[in-house]
Amino acid sequence: VYACNFTNLMYTMAAELLKNTHIPFSALLPLIDETAAKIHALAPADAQTGPARRNDENVMNHHLALLNDEQRVVYSILSEAIKKRNR
């Protein structure tokens, strides 16, 4: 479930975020492919990147300001889980 079903939900939420932009979901495919390929060579924890991994509160606060309530909750929970594992 974590490796597939929840991942598909994240793709759906990303597509929803792009809905009102002129950016097609297909623009994310190289990033998605690169992310999936990394775990063939690295442990998932070692492949983790992003503002929560760097503990970049400024970027995370900017992201949160752009999200709706549901998106903020999901973003916050996942970011805290990443930060907890990288202390």
Predicted regions and their residues:
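Active-site-proximal catalytic alpha-helix in oxidoreductases
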Residues: 1-19, 32-40, 44
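NAD(P)-dependent Rossmann-like dehydrogenase/reductase catalytic/cofactor-binding core
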Residues: 26-87
